[in-house]
Amino acid sequence: MVAVFRLAPPEAIEILDQTLLPFEEQVIRIADVAALCEAIGALRIRGAPLLGLAGAAGLALAASQNGPTDKDLSHAARVITATRPTAVDLGLRAGDALELALALPVDERAGALWAYAARLHGDRIREDAAISAFGADLLVERGSVLTHCNTGEL
């Protein structure tokens, strides 16, 4: 199975294009904030927790590629959040990442943001595994599942 989300610091993040599922599994490499915003707006990235992870990773991308100045990071956080203003986790995690970065010296920001995104990613993997283990016990041999909003690791 292809991973839904992968960090590739400091150059990029990789996502599974969810608009093509279930017929095709295509990984997209995202190397800048503009490409991330396009992917979020086009619903290639879906689900509240994954959108939150994308918001944090987007700030890490911005710090690595555009410079980690207060102005650049604040702009990146606003642009990312504006792509899906009703996606609460997106705005929360982008805001948390911005707050973390602004409290640090400029030369420490990119590394700290990638570490924050990695921690969120690890949390997501563990939570998805727990949801899957719990849900597996509820399925019968040939049961059906209807997902709503957060499909976890699909």
Kindly give the residue locations of the regions a language model identified.
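N-terminal active-site beta-alpha-beta segment that forms phosphate/nucleotide-binding
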Residues: 44-154
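Positively charged, low-complexity intrinsically disordered leader regions
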Residues: 1-34, 38
